[in-house]
Regions:
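Non-globular, low-confidence helical/coil segments that flank catalytic cores
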Residues: 1-241
């Protein structure tokens, strides 16, 4: 089967570090992502999807590429407007393919379809690649850091969109998962990727309240650790700290 990875994670650097701190600092990929992939016997990624160019989504790409064979990097066309990102891609010298709404990637018993962006953006939050897929009877929506503006565009383009599992946009921030979006997609489960005690205080209490009002089951990486979907004919959800 194919292995698809959406975003690598990465540390946002909030200023200059002393040299000894730089040397001792290890990436999130070295601490968690790479060991996990190796533990599952994964040494090859067929599609490395980078939703957008924020460091906390693609900052560990170079570290990952040194340890795992990446067959193809998938990005939005707007991401190519960021010079530092383009320089990184050239340095890695790996196959790169841009994705746009309507493209499909085969995975499991179905495919993941790109729903967004619908036009060329700038690689920022509202230019995030959004993927929708139906796998073993459940529907999933992965939204990167998409915020309200992008969610409204998505609703206008796909007025019948319904999903079972939502990967909440922008780490559960206040500016994403707006009420009209949540009411339309009718997701039963929200997955929130956020660092423990992060400085942004993600997820925002307002967003959590919206999920609660709609009786959604919420899984949070800051509280429960890794969230794993396992199964073949049906899904079982596990959390691993």
């Amino acid at each position: 089967g194919k292995t698809i990875l959406i975003d690598t994670g990465g540390k946002v650097d909030f200023g200059q570090k002393e040299e000894w701190k730089k040397r001792r600092s290890t990436s999130n990929a070295e601490r968690t992502l790479i060991p996990y992939l190796k533990s599952r016997g994964i040494d090859r990624i067929d599609h490395m999807i980078l939703t957008h160019t924020d460091t906390d989504h693609m900052g560990d790409l170079e570290v990952l590429a040194a340890k795992v064979s990446i067959q193809e990097i998938n990005i939005s066309k707007g991401s190519l407007k960021k010079d530092s990102f383009v320089r990184l891609l050239k340095r890695l010298n790996l196959p790169v393919k841009t994705l746009e709404a309507g493209d499909q990637l085969s995975i499991f018993d179905g495919s993941a379809e790109v729903l967004y962006p619908v036009e060329v953006g700038d690689g920022s939050n509202n230019d995030s690649l959004v993927l929708y897929g139906r796998f073993y009877g459940w529907t999933f929506l992965f939204t990167g850091d998409l915020e309200e503006e992008g969610e409204k565009t998505l609703l206008a383009r796909y007025p019948q969109l319904r999903v079972d599992v939502l990967k909440a946009g922008h780490h559960g921030s206040k500016g994403s998962s707006h009420p009209a979006f949540l009411k339309q997609i009718q997701a039963k489960i929200a997955l929130i990727s956020a660092g423990e005690k992060n400085r942004y205080q993600h997820p925002h209490r307002e967003t959590l309240e919206r999920f609660k009002e709609l009786q959604m089951t919420v899984f949070r990486t800051d509280q429960q650790g890794a969230i794993r979907f396992r199964g073949w004919n049906q899904w079982k959800i596990e959390t691993v700290r």
